[in-house]
């Protein structure tokens, strides 16, 4: 029994030590970690590597092809001697060598434009990594704020529960003394149950926000985790005058990764139109071949067998040539590919227009939200000032015996709740201003 008790105590102490040693994450660390470990960012990186290989393949298409072949074996019955080109009925052993290949000479710029298209695609894929990291950073910052907000909400709920319990204690004494009906106590107990339920909901929301944040970081859900609460008063923010939505939008067009990526995709699509168009025209190519043969029955004029390497040298022959390939009928493939490439270009132009429209809408919405958040923050400050005055006045009345303890505690808790709500609204306002700075190209930092 003593051993079990000691084990339980050790377990509790270890858990407490682990919790105290849990490293707290600030926003900068969260964003940096997510940029390296988020699955979406890793997938974008893999896609960029695949696109780089496609570019390398397009560049290698410029080089001539070369293939080597050799064959050897016996021949039986009536067959052609590969060295003399005469029919023979004798069994013989022969071997042949061949090296051949071809090279594109002129193809209406198809190879050059294909390389250019793949270069733009490779650049777009690299920018897509930045876009994925950007999106993840924004999501991380959003859930970081929600974690902070849900922590503050838990504090507010706990203050409300403490206030309700104090009211219940006083009311229970009044009921016992017969000064108030029991219904008052029952109503307060019912309200306490509601407050407790609200606290549970707040804790559930907090846990869900933490789990989502862990998923964005690609962290194990069971890993101990906590975020650092910054001193909101020390966070620098720009003025509304420097964050006018139209100004921010014009800057965002040049600094947001998605907008850069769309421009590169359009350039790649334009080159692909030229590639597919060139496929409908004739192309000129060169070819070459090097060949030699050997057989074990070859003899010279004296009837002596010709040695192996002498035969290979004497039978060595070369050829060079030019060819032209004219696409006369390809089941409509070339024409359809050309039309598809033009539609793909048009689709990329529409994607750019849609993305820019969405960006502008997001920026104007963010600006409106920031203005509303400032109004809520100002209202929360006024609420704190009012609650402070009420508490100061009630405290003076309490000191001279004109106010009961319950009323003083209620006013004190109201002040605490107002302060917590003000901090939450201030965080919300600062984040919405930081979102505008993010669109402006300044990143996300507190």
What is each stretch, according to the model?
Residues 175-179, 398-402, 439:
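A short glycine-centered flexible hinge/capping loop motif at secondary-structure junctions
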Residues 20-143, 284, 288, 332-335, ...:
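Short flexible linkers and secondary-structure junctions
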Residues 25, 135-251, 369, 373:
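Periplasmic alpha-helical coiled-coil/stalk elements that build and connect Gram-negative outer-membrane
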Residues 6-13:
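Bacterial N-terminal signal peptides
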Residues 18-67, 221, 228-267, 371, ...:
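Bacterial Sec-pathway N-terminal export signals of envelope proteins
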Residues 6, 19, 221, 421-446:
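Acidic, low-complexity, intrinsically disordered peripheral segments
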Residues 21-23, 69-103, 231-240, 274, ...:
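Small/polar, glycine/serine/threonine/aspartate-rich low-complexity segments that form flexible
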Residues 42-46, 59-60, 91, 105-133, ...:
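Sec/SRP-type N-terminal targeting helices
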